A protein has these predicted regions:
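Extreme N-terminal starter segment of soluble prokaryotic enzymes
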Residues: 1-2
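Glycine-rich beta-strand-centered segment in the early N-terminal region that forms part
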Residues: 21-35, 45-96, 101
Length: 120
């Protein structure tokens, strides 16, 4: 997969070919057709939110499901999807009611687990 990868803060993103692992239980692989780099990414790129590097940026995306992991039933390969990954605690009242986008702990950047970048 080709991805925009941050390898060092305050440096331009690099477009790299990366390896991907197969999807695990309850995960899907999406062939991303378009992705945005937003203010969250900008804060990471500038070192405002320290993160382990290298990191794939662009967590707001649209694409096509290409592979399902075990247990996935809501989508199937060929489905068009949009997503915006946001970290969430899984325990607050919003997460407990399925509204993870409102999670009160979502700005805790230690919870951000994005794609790890490994060169192909």
């Amino acid at each position: 997969m080709r991805a925009a990868v941050l390898t060092e803060v305050n440096k331009p993103l690099q477009i790299l070919d990366l390896e991907q692992e197969p999807p695990k239980a309850n995960e899907v692989r999406v062939q991303v057709k378009a992705a945005g780099v937003c203010m969250s990414d900008w804060h990471i790129m500038n070192g405002d939110w320290p993160m382990p590097l290298p990191m794939v940026l662009g967590h707001e995306a649209a694409g096509v499901v290409v592979e399902n992991g075990p247990g996935v039933t809501a989508v199937k390969p060929g489905d068009h999807v949009i997503f915006s990954f946001r970290p969430h605690c899984g325990r607050c009242r919003y997460c407990s009611s399925g509204r993870t986008v409102l999670c009160v702990g979502h700005n805790d950047t230690s919870r951000w687990v994005m794609h790890a970048a490994r060169r192909a």
